[in-house]
């Protein structure tokens, strides 16, 4: 069974990059996205269930890995996409 704690543990290395922060609010866990250039929160996502949190973080993780592969300077290659897909699969397996 997937729990919030398991999701947090799986994504801890990604979260330690400092772009995303998870806070517990009176309405549930919330994912905040920080823009270092503008020095402000640019995205807020409430996660009602551990599955919601896992899905949202997996999407952010995938986008981040795609960005890291190119640094926004070129299109993703098939090799880039394959490597990101492998990293995504590893995260999915850890969530099981």
Show where each model-derived region lies:
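Acidic, low-complexity, intrinsically disordered interaction modules
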Residues: 23-81, 85
């Amino acid at each position: 069974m997937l729990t919030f704690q398991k999701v947090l543990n799986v994504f801890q290395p990604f979260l330690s990059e400092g772009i995303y922060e998870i806070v517990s609010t009176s309405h549930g866990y919330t994912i905040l996205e920080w823009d270092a250039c503008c020095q402000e929160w640019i995205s807020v996502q409430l996660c009602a269930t551990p599955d919601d949190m896992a899905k949202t973080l997996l999407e952010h993780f995938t986008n981040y890995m795609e960005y890291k592969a190119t640094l926004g300077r070129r299109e993703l290659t098939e090799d880039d996409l394959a490597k990101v897909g492998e990293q995504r699969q590893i995260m999915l397996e850890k969530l099981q």
